């Protein structure tokens, strides 16, 4: 897999976070944590802070990311703490999920794909969640002006309310919009959804 510009930038960010010891859950991960149970797929896990927190709460976690830097760190932590985490480097644009999970999580990932890929991967995550399980998805949405980490020719800003529409046939447990300042005068506009798959 050839690293994309965004993967290289995240490698740099992760290296800086490790140097600074900044391993706190971000606000979206903190929101997700109470909904994680059973076997968890963390799709775009970054440094694995959420995967570690979930494993400490009794979950088993499959954690995937395109950053070798991040996965190397997570493997080290999981081994050191004897946590049930399988951490793998994967090209998440094309990765095929081959098992069902009790929880699927994708925080801050899908916007780095072109739109057809983002939608296809979202549908794949939906289809590999067991009935009664939770999906936790966080994306950048239209209105975002912070684009410096995104490939100009291949990114996806979801429409406002689009996540809720894509989960209309599930029970929506949480649907939040939030904004954060980016660099300069830019804005990051996010939507986060937690949805329960019908069944059980």
Question: What feature does the model see in each segment?
Answer:
Residues 105:
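A conserved beta-strand element that flanks and buttresses the S-adenosyl-L-methionine
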Residues 108-109:
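Short catalytic micro-motifs in class I SAM-dependent methyltransferases
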Residues 43:
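Conserved beta-strand/loop positions that form the S-adenosyl-L-methionine
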Residues 1-37, 46-96, 113-120, 124, ...:
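Class I (Rossmann-like) S-adenosyl-L-methionine-dependent methyltransferase catalytic domain
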């Amino acid at each position: 897999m050839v690293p994309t510009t965004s993967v290289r930038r995240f490698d740099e960010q992760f290296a800086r976070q490790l140097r600074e010891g900044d391993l706190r859950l971000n606000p979206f991960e903190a929101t997700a944590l109470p909904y994680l149970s059973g076997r968890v797929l963390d799709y775009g896990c970054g440094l694995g802070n959420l995967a570690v927190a979930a494993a400490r709460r009794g979950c088993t976690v499959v954690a995937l990311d395109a950053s070798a830097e991040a996965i190397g760190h997570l493997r080290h932590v999981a081994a050191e703490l004897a946590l049930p985490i399988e951490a793998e480097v994967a090209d998440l644009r094309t990765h095929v999920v081959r098992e069902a999970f009790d929880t699927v999580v994708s925080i801050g990932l899908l916007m780095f794909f072109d739109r057809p890929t983002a939608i296809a991967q979202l549908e794949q995550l939906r289809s590999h969640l067991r009935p009664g399980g939770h999906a936790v998805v966080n994306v950048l949405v239209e209105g975002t002006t912070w684009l410096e980490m995104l490939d100009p020719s291949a990114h996806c800003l979801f429409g406002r309310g689009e996540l809720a529409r894509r989960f209309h046939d599930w029970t929506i447990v949480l649907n939040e919009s939030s904004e954060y300042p980016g660099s300069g005068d830019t804005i990051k506009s996010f939507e986060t959804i937690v949805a329960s798959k019908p069944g059980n």
